[in-house]
A protein has these predicted regions:
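Short, glycine/acidic-enriched loop or turn micro-motifs at the edges of active sites
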Residues: 45-46, 106
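A short acidic, amphipathic alpha-helical/loop segment
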Residues: 51-55, 150-154, 181
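Acidic, His- and aromatic-enriched active-site or binding-groove loops in soluble protein domains
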Residues: 159-170
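N-terminal pre-catalytic segment of deacetylase/amide-hydrolase enzymes
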Residues: 2-3, 16-39, 47-51, 58, ...
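Sec-dependent N-terminal signal peptides
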Residues: 4-14
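Metal-dependent polysaccharide deacetylase catalytic core of the NodB/CE4 family, i.e.
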Residues: 35-37, 57-150, 157-160, 189-202
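A short, acidic, amphipathic alpha-helical segment used as a generic capping/interface helix at domain edges
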Residues: 176-184
Length: 205
């Protein structure tokens, strides 16, 4: 959790950093910022609702939360797995401006299942997210970060994008690592994608 808060603090320092020039040009990022960073959270863990989202909102940020519908609890009264979010919570997050998107219905690794089964898994999760949040997912995050080409061709259909690169932010990350990452993004005018799972439990917490 401390690393996550430091991550947000570091980005806050750079949130007003923009290029200045007298010439007219098209800005690459909103507000002519020097770089862009997406906060992404995998697997729909409960503390992403209780800890991550509130900390983002407190600082004026919003995140992208990719979920597996098969593991999401039905609602706040029907909890079968206390480590996972509920559809009610995801709806609330969506209403507050966070993106709730597709990570596969059952987190199926693209290399281990037939393509038609992968397609059904993606479509089923899209339908569940739309039905429960009212918003159709327009991005996709690859389960296990497996980007098998045949699977990618299915996943990109009707999307504005998929997560093809990411910077893992977990227990091995240090404040110095994050500072260097942000500095590099600014220097290169790049778009960084931070990937986090659990803050206090779960993968790479």
């Amino acid at each position: 959790m401390k690393k996550f808060l430091f991550y947000l603090f570091t980005l806050g320092l750079f949130s007003n950093y923009a290029f200045s020039s007298d010439s007219i040009y098209v800005a690459r990022y909103k507000g002519d910022k020097a770089c862009a960073i997406s906060y992404t959270f995998d697997d729909g863990l409960a503390e992403q609702y209780t800890l991550a989202a509130p900390q983002l909102e407190k600082r004026g940020f919003r995140g992208t939360f990719c979920v597996n519908g098969a593991k999401v609890n039905k609602d706040n009264k029907h909890i079968t797995d206390t480590t996972r979010v509920t559809w009610t919570q995801l709806k609330e997050m969506s209403d507050k401006g966070h993106e709730i998107t597709n990570h596969g219905w059952a987190h199926k690794n693209f290399s281990r299942f037939p393509l038609e089964e992968i397609r059904e898994d993606i479509v089923k999760n899209d339908s569940a997210i739309l039905a429960n949040t009212g918003v159709m997912p327009r991005t996709f995050f690859y389960p296990n970060n497996n980007k098998k080409e045949e699977g990618k061709r299915i996943a990109v259909q009707n999307r504005v994008g998929t997560r093809t690169k990411q910077r893992s932010i977990g227990r091995k990350s240090t404040p110095r690592d994050l500072e260097k990452w942000v500095a590099t993004l600014i220097a290169t005018n790049d778009w960084g994608v931070g990937m986090t799972h659990g803050l206090t439990y779960g993968y790479d917490a």
